[in-house]
């Protein structure tokens, strides 16, 4: 298997894992799932209503379906600070995510 096809297979695997986790989060607690993923209700409805076949087809894209929510270097660096306790890092992360705009269908 070439390096390119191996990388595409890994992207597909990550995509499928992401979509399945997203669906599970949304089915268990829609509001919390939307918050954790930073997505709009419209996008949440699309994700939760995908059939298994649609989910697998979407995961087979050659592009990553998930992305970093923090585009700011300073923000990401502060979240990765090793000097903080786990509880403080989780609280700080939740506060920062709450201030980020949600993704919507374009």
Curated annotation (Swiss-Prot):
GO molecular function, one term: DNA binding
Highest taxon of source: Bacteria
Pfam families listed in its UniProt record: FlhD (PF05247)
One cellular-component annotation, GO: cytoplasm
Main location: cytoplasm
Tagged with keyword Disulfide bond: yes
Subunit description: Homodimer; disulfide-linked. Forms a heterohexamer composed of two FlhC and four FlhD subunits. Each FlhC binds a FlhD dimer, forming a heterotrimer, and a hexamer assembles by dimerization of two heterotrimers.
Family the UniProt entry places it in: Belongs to the FlhD family.
Protein name as catalogued: Flagellar transcriptional regulator FlhD
UniProt organism field: Burkholderia mallei (strain SAVP1)
Gene that encodes the chain: flhD
